[in-house]
Amino acid sequence: MAKEKFVRTKPHVNVGTIGHIDHGKSTLTAAITKYLSLKGLAQYVPYDQIDKAPEEKARGITINITHVEYQTEKRHYAHIDCPGHADYIKNMITGAAQMDGAILVVAATDGPMPQTREHVLLARQVEVPYMIVFINKTDMVDDPELIDLVEMEVRDLLSQYGYPGDEVPVIRGSALKAVEAPNDPNHEAYKPIQELLDAMDNYIPEPQREVDKPFLMPIEDVFSITGRGTVVTGRIERGRIKPGDEVEIIGLSYEIRKTVVTSVEMFRKELDEGIAGDNVGCLLRGIDKDEVERGQVLAAPGSIKPHKRFKAQVYVLKKEEGGRHTPFTKGYKPQFYIRTADVTGEIVGLPEGVEMVMPGDHVEMEIELIYPVAIEKGQRFAVREGGRTVGAGVVTEVIE
């Protein structure tokens, strides 16, 4: 049986459910697929299937993630849901599954809880741009004023972390009631689900495609072709490149070299244009083989700068995950793998009151590399020591 072809007719958007444990994230995910399956726009994925999420590896870390897909009249959605709190943190930090918008699920019976706050903070730090709130379990609260109070608290919380708390769509409903409702899409219990989908279609803008962003390609390999010059190879991370385009070579020092790409090749054939996702070789004008190396990036002029010092949110692997067995303190010097660069760095700052970082923690830290590399906010990286991954991080602020 041939695999179904992915027909790209509708715009594609990545979303996910976030929020405190047992507030109904997976039930809501199941409810969405059930409702849309009745309209022929999804396959129903029951709760127990979502809850036993398969394992994935991202940057050397094992994460349990469920991916479901569904369509509305307007769009195609890929939706992620993680069963465990630690899985969310790992997913957000590694960027295993990135989100164009998140659905924050808050139980009306509890209101915002510690993990609600933690997920919102992380979403902000990893730049999940849009947030929609689903107040769940409203059938279990008799007094509507209590639900109003929960809504106020959630809007407040979002504002504290830089989301537009006053404008965020808030939908009230019961995910369980929708899952248990009869198979008639017009049934009352599905109304909040349709409201949520409308909010997603209208409030979360269509994301800018990677190919429309400024060109960037991490350099994986360098070789010289006699009589032609120096070729650098790698996978184009974003944007597009064609012969004649000016680029900058960035990283490993503060000096930025300008050059022109004179040819773009894929499988030894010349291309008119390379785009995001392509593995290509770029022939560089007037650059010797020893003037460029793995770990640098080729980028559109002015689009990214080399930096040594930055703040990052880092998840430190537990011993059971193959990480360190002992804590570390300020002054710890592991290797940082940033795109194709492998560079030693030092932990120069930890939050106030944090003396040591234990395996299993996630913590904001300040890092200083021994030489500058191309870095920007939202950049993911791995932390390694002695050939094994001991952590994963995301840049939250560039300092110098």
UniProtKB/Swiss-Prot annotation:
It is found in: Cytoplasm. Residues 10-208 form the tr-type G domain. It catalyses: GTP + H2O = GDP + phosphate + H(+). Residues 19-26 are annotated as: G1. PROSITE patterns: G_TR_1 (PS00301), G_TR_2 (PS51722). Keywords: Cytoplasm, Elongation factor, GTP-binding, Hydrolase, Magnesium, Metal-binding, Nucleotide-binding, Protein biosynthesis. GO terms for cellular component: cytosol. Residues 174-176 are annotated as: G5. Mg(2+) binds at residue 26. GTP binds at residues 19-26, 81-85, 136-139. Residues 81-84 are annotated as: G3. It comes from the Bacteria. Its EC number is 3.6.5.3. One of its GO terms (molecular function) is GTP binding. Gene3D superfamilies: P-loop containing nucleotide triphosphate hydrolases, Translation factors. InterPro entries: EF-Tu_GTP-bd, EF-Tu_GTPase, EFTu-like_2, EFTU_2, G_TR_CS, P-loop_NTPase, Small_GTP-bd, T_Tr_GTP-bd_dom. Residues 60-64 are annotated as: G2. Residues 136-139 are annotated as: G4. Its main location: cytoplasm. Monomer. GTP hydrolase that promotes the GTP-dependent binding of aminoacyl-tRNA to the A-site of ribosomes during protein biosynthesis. Belongs to the TRAFAC class translation factor GTPase superfamily. Classic translation factor GTPase family. EF-Tu/EF-1A subfamily. This is Elongation factor Tu. It comes from Thermotoga petrophila (strain ATCC BAA-488 / DSM 13995 / JCM 10881 / RKU-1). The gene is tuf.
